[in-house]
Amino acid sequence: MDAFNYRGGELFAEGVALSAIAERFGTPTYVYSRAHIEAQYRTFADALEGMPHLVCFAVKANSNLGVLNVLARLGAGFDIVSGGELERVLAAGGSADKIVFSGVGKTREDMRRALEVGVHCFNIESTDELGSRLQIVAAELGVRAPISLRVNPDVDAGTHPYISTGLKENKFGIAIADAEDVYVRAAQLPNLEVLGVDCHIGSQLTTLEPFIDALDRLLALVDRLGDCGIYLRHIDLGGGVGVRYRDEEPPLVADYIKAVRERLDGRDLALMFEPGRYIVANAGVLLTQVEYLKHTEHKDFAIVDAAMNDLIRPALYQAWMDVTAVRPRDTAARSYDIVGPICETGDFLAKGRELALEEGDLLAVHSAGAYGFVMSSNYNTRGRCAEVLVDGDQAFEVRRRETVAELFAGESLLPE
């Protein structure tokens, strides 16, 4: 579904005009659609109906409590990578026993807290996490820690190198060539309980082949482990299903799940997925206002009140984000670079966009629901945006805008 549509010459989020949101909450503001989030989650859940499964939303994509609560109400699980994300999920009403704890840098304190609340399992990223960390922490608490090994299948996801995570040179996971030995070691540790196998080969994948290649390699490993007397209960295929930003043609989730289920036919394995971008990317826009237009001999600039500190994907990944006027004009369009107030040449949201603009116009940067606010910063001492969640014809502020005073409230001067 597309939650952002024009009505009477104006862009709406579900049943709320974006201009009304700007008037009420100001700009820049992230705007999310509850209906879109729910529809995307159900695409996964419905395709898995009839078999044991858990769809764990990747909290790193969008960690707003309002967004997490929408998913918790649907019965979603959650994929986390820090103690902070654990506390967010719990505060949002998520069930601890539906949380998988991933990440290469889990601290002992993180592990202890996760064991105390009873997470579903830890996705182990290295051998050092086993004996020298998790085994010791679990023994101190007198419990068995449920684990899954994150196996690196050495599959090229064919995506941006910063978000490709399944190659042998990446920092993530345990090399598939070493995995069997690590499983044998884990099975011998008294305070660990081996549950499954996990992999995540990258983000924003637009073909099925890398997923299926990785799955086939994991299933071969599952068979070898069975020969050793180690029987796994689940297989976690991570996230990575791409979305449409411009002209991509990502695979349908139904086709992906169908191919996976065919390969698992006859196997007693539950299926787990960790989608993030797929669920929230196109559920959100960044709403921004044109401060003024700057025309030079070589370029035309639309200087807006949002900047790279609010949305860093274009600067960091050279990501293409669609930009449209909230109230399109009938006048002649010009090619504009959409730039912010940050003191960096790399501070841009889009380049070379054909738009008819005037000072004060509102723009919507689309597909901003994933890796938007969560990657924002206070660079140039700029307060972070407000976040608004739209539910039908109502808009709710689920995060208020930061004030300048809050930015240095935790700082202090040296004594005289």
From Swiss-Prot:
Domain of life of the organism encoding this protein: Bacteria
Residues where substrate binds: R277, R313, Y317, E344, Y371
Similarity annotation: Belongs to the Orn/Lys/Arg decarboxylase class-II family. LysA subfamily.
GO MF annotation: an example: pyridoxal phosphate binding
Pathway involvement of the protein, from the record: Amino-acid biosynthesis; L-lysine biosynthesis via DAP pathway; L-lysine from DL-2,6-diaminopimelate: step 1/1
CDD domains: PLPDE_III_DapDC (cd06828)
Protein EC: 4.1.1.20
Any one Gene Ontology BP term: lysine biosynthetic process via diaminopimelate
N6-(pyridoxal phosphate)lysine PTM positions: K60
Protein name: Diaminopimelate decarboxylase
Keywords assigned: Amino-acid biosynthesis, Decarboxylase, Lyase, Lysine biosynthesis, Pyridoxal phosphate
Assembly description: Homodimer.
